[in-house]
């Protein structure tokens, strides 16, 4: 599900991220509120680092290991990653 008016890339990224987080947290996709801190759902350092690895392996994004702590909700992660993916190569 995407926010009305959201760019297609952000919507696709939100779907991928929500599915990936649901898998790692052992929760149904529909149970994750994008505004709720992921720690509420049991996000820990192992899940956070696994997500960073998924972003690198599957999306080609190099992100800091503190990503989930710096951006603790799905909405915050999507906002950050959308900016990151829009940045020109070789900044």
Model-derived regions, located:
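Flexible, low-complexity inter-domain linkers and amphipathic docking helices that mediate domain-domain
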Residues: 1-91
